[in-house]
Amino acid sequence: MPPVTTSAVILRSIEYGDFDLIVTFFTQAQGKRAALAKNARKSFKRFGGALELFSKVSIVYAHGKKKGGLPLLSESNLEQHFSNIRMDIHKTALASLWAETIYSWAEEEHAQEEIFQLLIRSLENLDNEKVDRDKVNILFLLRFLALAGLSPSLDQCVLCCRSLEDWGQGGICFDHARGGIVCPKCGVCLAPGPVLSVGAVKQLLWLNKGDLAAAGRMKLSREAMDRGRDLLESFLAYHLGKEPKSLRFLKDLRRRHF
C-alpha cells in the first residue's frame, strides 16, 4: 500500500513499549484509523506537538512489511492546535468528550464525512472566545446524534404521538429506551432520563432548527440550557453503553461550579 496523506483529528494516543505510541485518528475519507508512531516518546523532534488530543493535523502513514500489523505513522504536521480551547479546562473537557465519543462510536475504516466536518466545525467554534461553549456543545450533540441516526424525539410523545403543544405545563419524562419524550397520559418511562420542562424541550427544538449564529441570537434560560445539555449527554451515554470518562470529569467541574 502506498503512503496515505490526509487531514485528521487526533482521538487518542496510548503508550506502546518503551518509546512508541499507538495513535488513533479520525479522517474524512477513511474514518477512524490507528497507526504506530515509532519513537514518538523517545524524541520530541520526531512529531513535535502534532500528536496531541483533538489537534487537526496532516499525517502520512503506510502499512509496514509485517502482514496484519498496524500502519506506521511517518509524519504528522500541525494544522490547527486550538490554543484557546487548551487554555480553558472546561473547553478542553468538552473537546475531549467529542473525541472520546467519536472514538467509541466510529467503526474502523468506515468513512463518516459529515461527522468529520461536524467535529472540525465544532472545534473551530469552541476555539472562538466570543462563542458560548455550552451552546456549541448542545449543537454538537444534537448534530452528532442526528448523523448517527439517534435523534431524540422531542416534538411529540413517542407512544401516542400527541404533540408537545397539547401537553400544557409540568415536568416531562424523557425515555432513553424509547428514544423520546413520554406524555403524562401514557405513563412512566422505561429508562428515565432527566425531567424536563416544556420550555426546556422547546428551546432544544429551536436550537436544533438553526445554526450557531442563530443560537447566538437566542436568549435561553440557564436552567433550560442545563436541562437540555444533561438530557443529550445522558442519551449519548445510553447509546454508547457507558458514560465517557471525559463526561464524568465535566460533571465534576460543573459540581464545583468551575
UniProtKB/Swiss-Prot annotation:
The keyword Transport does not apply. GO terms for cellular component: bacterial nucleoid. It comes from the Bacteria. Gene3D superfamilies: Nucleic acid-binding proteins, Recombination protein O, C-terminal domain. Keywords: DNA damage, DNA recombination, DNA repair. InterPro entries: ARFGAP/RecO, DNA_rep/recomb_RecO_N, NA-bd_OB-fold, RecO, RecO_C. The keyword DNA repair applies. One of its GO terms (biological process) is DNA recombination. Coiled coil: none annotated. HAMAP family: RecO. NCBIfam families: reco (TIGR00613). Involved in DNA repair and RecF pathway recombination. Belongs to the RecO family. This is DNA repair protein RecO. The lineage of its organism: Bacteria, Pseudomonadati, Thermodesulfobacteriota, Desulfobacteria, Desulfobacterales. The gene is recO.
